[in-house]
């Protein structure tokens, strides 16, 4: 019966969450009443569409293999060449649409729960659902402000952020002439929501990796604090996650490799990396099916760069198991080597479960804490965190701990950022967000007809354009400069 109700509520809310941008209209039909009903509403709000993976096309983690013969998905091209708008042929902006739909679901729950006191029997579930709603709203606004507004920095706090409805009724009243609140206000609200979520979720039982629990929430808080330069708080939140979970020792992958004629057979279309016990590091799955990403087909146009792969191949005599996430192991002497190329993305394949995109994982807490240490003059502690990570990534017979004495404060930070790049490649759009906060470096992409496209240092295109549909609905809203 509950499943039938959930389906009904999901279809009901889909009717008024599937409209353009913030244009969400209520309908009179069966409405949720109990805490369990609103739990079902909230579950319908968790994103089940990809809202970040295309951003990797715009980074230094991806190149175009022009020898590939597979058909090119034309909607990928504006991202790769940094077009003035990422919307292909004026198609709707699914990122904007998905994120604001999820905000609406969260707001619906928070509106209903505001001022209510649950019964003793309801209290635990009531607080869990409310805490998840706060966490989900913060998560969505984190993505919205990092996609459509300037990065967090003192000089950007008063610049236009994104529309920020905090009630479901706000959406109904403001489908026209929406207002972009400032960047600073959005980040302030994200932190407020995370604080409220923490109060509700602490001590609550996890309900699965497709929902926020307290540990996943702390991992997300560590991310937010890192982005906002609150390094002490980032260290504290990341430490909670690190103390609560254990890293997967990739030496266990050796059993996949022993006795194989080709290493590529270990992580092929049948077995992605996520099918190993590596999945135990995942704290939160999000978005659509991970094996639908653009980078894991052998003959696809867009592939991981060799620069990324080479960060896992620093020493030819050392086996870093992470190389197998990005290395195609194609035979250079084969007729189709040029088309296959040296790289492929093996994280996802045709799993039967656990196949959504990685939203948060344990290793992010390690590289976040290491970066926070490095930025606060604790370079030795940063290297210690890297060693804790690398001993689980490198073959035991090859592993040699990094020597703290070999690093200056500057080189320690650089190494941390390199390990972060490897660990978080293709996870939740993090590379694009990191590039934005790390000075918006210049990037060059070679594409068809020998043309080289350039994203300049500090380029305005590091901020996505406000969707055309929103521009039409809110003609007075400032758009992002180009």
Go through each PLM region and give its residues.
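Short, surface-exposed recognition loops and adjoining beta-strand edges that mediate ligand/DNA contacts
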Residues: 28-32, 58-68, 149-162, 203-291, ...
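Extended ligand-binding clefts on enzyme/binding-domain cores
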Residues: 39, 228-229, 235-361, 411-432, ...
């Amino acid at each position: 019966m509950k499943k039938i109700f959930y389906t009904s509520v999901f279809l009901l809310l889909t009717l008024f969450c599937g409209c353009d941008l913030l244009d969400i209209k209520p309908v009179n039909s069966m409405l949720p009443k109990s805490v369990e009903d609103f739990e079902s509403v909230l579950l319908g709000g968790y994103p089940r569409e990809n809202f970040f993976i295309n951003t990797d096309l715009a980074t230094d983690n991806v190149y175009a293999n022009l020898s590939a013969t597979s058909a090119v998905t034309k909607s990928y091209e504006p991202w790769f060449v940094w077009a003035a708008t990422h919307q292909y042929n004026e198609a709707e902006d699914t990122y904007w649409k998905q994120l604001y739909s999820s905000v609406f679901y969260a707001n619906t729950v928070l509106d209903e729960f505001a001022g209510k006191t649950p019964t003793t029997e309801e209290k635990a579930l009531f607080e869990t659902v409310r805490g998840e709603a706060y966490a989900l709203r913060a998560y969505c606004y984190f993505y919205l402000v990092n996609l459509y507004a300037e990065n967090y920095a003192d000089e950007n706090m008063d610049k236009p952020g994104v529309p920020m409805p905090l009630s479901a009724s706000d959406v109904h009243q403001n489908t026209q002439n929406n207002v972009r609140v400032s960047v600073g206000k959005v980040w302030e609200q994200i932190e407020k929501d995370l604080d409220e979520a923490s109060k509700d979720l602490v001590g609550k039982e996890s309900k699965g990796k497709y929902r926020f629990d307290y540990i996943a929430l702390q991992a997300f808080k560590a991310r937010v604090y890192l982005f906002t330069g609150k390094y002490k708080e980032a260290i504290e939140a990341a430490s909670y996650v690190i103390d609560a979970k254990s890293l997967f020792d990739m030496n266990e992958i050796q059993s996949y490799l022993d006795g194989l004629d080709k290493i590529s057979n270990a992580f092929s279309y049948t077995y992605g990396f996520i099918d190993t016990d590596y999945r135990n590091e995942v704290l939160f799955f999000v978005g659509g099916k991970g094996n639908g990403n653009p980078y894991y087909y052998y003959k696809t146009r867009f592939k991981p760069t060799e620069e990324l792969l080479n960060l896992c191949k620093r020493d030819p005599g050392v086996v870093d198991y992470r190389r197998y996430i990005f290395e195609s192991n194609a035979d250079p002497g084969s007729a189709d080597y040029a088309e296959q190329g040296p790289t492929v993305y093996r994280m996802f394949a045709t799993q039967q479960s656990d196949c959504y995109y990685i939203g948060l994982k344990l290793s992010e807490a390690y590289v976040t804490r290491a970066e926070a240490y490095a930025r606060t003059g604790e370079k030795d502690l940063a290297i210690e965190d890297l060693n804790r990570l690398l001993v689980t990534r490198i073959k035991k017979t090859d592993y040699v701990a990094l020597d703290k004495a070999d690093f200056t404060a500057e080189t320690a930070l650089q190494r941390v950022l390199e390990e972060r790049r490897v660990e978080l490649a293709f996870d939740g759009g993090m590379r694009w967000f990191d590039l934005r906060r790390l000075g918006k470096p210049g990037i060059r992409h070679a594409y068809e007809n020998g043309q080289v496209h350039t994203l300049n240092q500090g380029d305005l295109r590091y901020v996505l354009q406000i969707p055309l549909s929103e521009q039409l609905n809110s003609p007075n809203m400032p758009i992002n400069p180009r």
